[in-house]
Amino acid sequence: MRGASVFLLAALAACSPGERAVAIPSPSSAVTVPRTSSPTPTATPAVRYVAIGASDTVGIGATDPVNGSWPARLAALLPPGSAYVNLGVSGSVTVQAKDAQLPGAVAQRPTVVSIWLAVNDMNATIEPASYRDALAAIVNELVARTDAKVFVGNVPDLRGVPAYQDADKVRLFALITAYNDVIATVTKGHPGRVVLVDLFIGSAPLVSTITVSGDGFHPSDEGYTLIADRFATALRAAGVPLRP
């Protein structure tokens, strides 16, 4: 499995050099969805949404990362009066997110949390077992210390992404499958609280030419729209109130 990771690391290095860790926005710059009318006894409850992730959570590749990332697009669908905090850090692997993002997420007292972390771990040659331990630690802590519903995205089929054009596609697919098996196992451990957001099945539109940005790796505006749609579908199915 480690050999497959070396192929991924080489491909990423060729297409996305020098990526620095940048977090936006901080909890102090959380966004509150404006109220459009005075609350009534039948008003839809507000949501406290926190996003945990890496550069795709930050919105790298979008024309306007702050407003065009997939979490920001998802937050735009929240009921009036809801709060949204994006804790994503570009370049983060899952164990780093556990240390740097999880405490802030718990402190926000969220009712909804999204997690999308995996590809950087794959590119960093982190074995699936180690990835599992880090992801499970994040999920278990959120379940134990918050009342949030947690939505965890898996890995799309990356074989058509330009950054992986020189990777061994058989090994790449095997590694994606191993990581997605881990994500499925972790999410199944908390039925009713943790939901798998499947970005793999039918993922061809997510990795088409128009949905990948000019760097050949991160999503474009069109890609972030499709990712937000996948998460929105999962949130609605789990009973989270979202606007049409």
Regions found by a protein language model. Give the residues of each.
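Bacterial N-terminal signal peptides that target proteins for export
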Residues: 1-7
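C-terminal motif of bacterial Sec signal peptides marking the signal peptidase cleavage site
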Residues: 11-14
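Serine-esterase "nucleophile elbow" of acetyl-processing enzymes
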Residues: 24-90, 102-109
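Alpha-helical cap/lid subdomain in secreted, periplasmic
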Residues: 76, 99-244
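Active-site-proximal substrate-binding core of FAD-dependent oxidoreductases
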Residues: 96
